[in-house]
Amino acid sequence: MIHGKKVVVVLPAYNAALTLEQTYREIPFDIVDEVVLVDDAGGDDTLSVGAKLGIKHLIQHEKNLGYGGNQKTCYRKALDFGADIIIMLHPDYQYTPKLIPAMAHLVATDIYPVVLGSRILGKGALEGGMPMVKYIANRILTLIQNIFINQKLSEYHTGYRAFSREVLESIRWDLNSDDFIFDNQIMAQCVDAGFKIGEVSCPTKYFAEASSINLHNSAIYGLGCLGVSIRYRLHRWGIWKYGLLK
């Protein structure tokens, strides 16, 4: 708990058995009240590792629902548990849990209702092992998205996010895609609803065990991001109604 607000960390997992313990051990339990681990039918020992670590809230999908579908389960459970602040952290150890207090503080003190852990903010992305092609693609996509969505974010593609309860109760994230594009749809929804988005610089860590989507899926994801941004702008101009927005 921080400033009297309950903090729940959600871990959307897919074959995270090799990195889950390292991630979990760094979670600051002096402020984190609950952890929810959702295994998206990955087929490895993620749930067994979670049980050995003492994670109380373990959920396994009977079939693979996709990255977005996993997040939907995570957020529903966090809200059910009475979370005031929900922090989504990938259990592949690409993002350091040590930033949870900073992100939670920004939400708890009403400075920002949405906070992103940005790998691009600062100069550590390439030093941390982010492939050059992904770095360039990230920068180009973010530039285009900032233009269409009228923001100045350093990246939209991080898997490290904090939301206030009000945010998740105000937008229709349940209507979003079950795929990777969920992340960009929920950002567009947050902006459309008038929620300010803050960022903290997060060290980049790419290594063999960390999860990553392949080139084909990355291309599909990139096109999807552009589609979300264009639909957002057309919606704001009143030209074409985007059903995910109000």
Tell where the protein language model's regions lie, with residue ranges.
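A conserved acidic beta->alpha catalytic loop
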Residues: D39-L47
